[in-house]
Amino acid sequence: MANCAIVGINWGDEGKGRMVDYLTDRFDVVVRYQGGGNAGHTVVNDKGKFALHLLPSGIFREGVVNILGNGVALDCENLYNEIETLRAAGVAITPENLKVSERASLLLPWHRELDALEEARLKDKKYGSTKQGIAPFYSDKYQKKTVLAGELLHPEHLKAHLADLLEWKNLTLTRVYGAKGYTMDELTAWIDDFGAKIKPFVANTTAFLREAQANGKRILFEAQLGALRDLDYGIYPYTTSSNAIAAYAPVGSGLPTAKLDEVVGVVKAYSSCVGEGPFTCEWFGDEAAKLREAGAEFGAKTGRPRRVGPIDLVATRYGVEMQGATSIALTKLDVLSYMDKIPLCAHYEIDGVQTDDFPFPVLLDRAKPVMEYMPGWQCDISGVRRWEDLPEAARSYVEYVEKAIGCPIGYVSVGAERESLILR
């Protein structure tokens, strides 16, 4: 397990943060390689409960170097606030254990504003953005209209670059949205405040990673969101604006020569989704409310109630294939303990035809779930620590899912704490 990626198989919120936190004692470096502050990785440890939006989940482990790669949307303001929150809880964060790629682009204040303005313009056709500026940021990045973190180390160049970007961006704000533009003084003040606080962490992380790889260091690549939110392979356009698949890890981390030895895909024992778009197995009413409360399904970033339903084996199998998962961590099995029978979406029916293949996005609105049911176990399993001590019905459920998705389940979680993970 020299190089390992931990990725989401579904819509995100599967429990990747707790898996990274659990596995980091086996690794020397943890790298976030895509996304920004639009999603949260929840970690529960002896220092408390934390929702990490930008910081890699290895930040709690002594001796682990954490890196924000070039593929990350670097929001200096939110990153600094997150650092200070963890420091207040007794977590040591220094340039020795946190490094920011000099090639990471900065998410600027206007990106968040443009995100909110566009969602308001779309009205009932909105995508369900978290309004953290992610889509405008990546749009600017691919238009080569962003500032690199390394420019914080070259203030005269940065000032001239910002002036060029300011003129261009104000045209969009004022003429497209009728909003107020920014002044150079406002932008400079933000850079002088938050950019200056992040500047000590900026480094040539590609050189660091190459040296680490040459010295046989073990590297863990941490993804955000899941395969169904991937820009290219997800449920477009209800996706994020970056690539959440494991194949992007070498590129977004700053180590394009990296070979992944293992890909751990994280799957929740039921389905959950934040945001708009097709969600074939969605429950509503009291049924949804009960599952949502049992699983504490509220967004780590927004606090919004998540959409929930039974596990979708069609979508999960597709996610496993897109991620190239070599093993699976099945999380939140304990949440299903209240059910007398456990529903699973085994197939889809589209226009009267049953299928096991995940369809092209436009067909998902016509897809209906074909359900199967398994016996429940109806007892508290949160204290179980060995596979053989789980109720037979719980083991049967895991084995059924494993066979249906075609990938071995190596980990089963029955709680949020580090120790509540069962190894098979």
Describe every region a protein language model picked out:
Residues 1-424:
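Non-transmembrane, aqueous-exposed alpha-helical and coiled segments at domain scale
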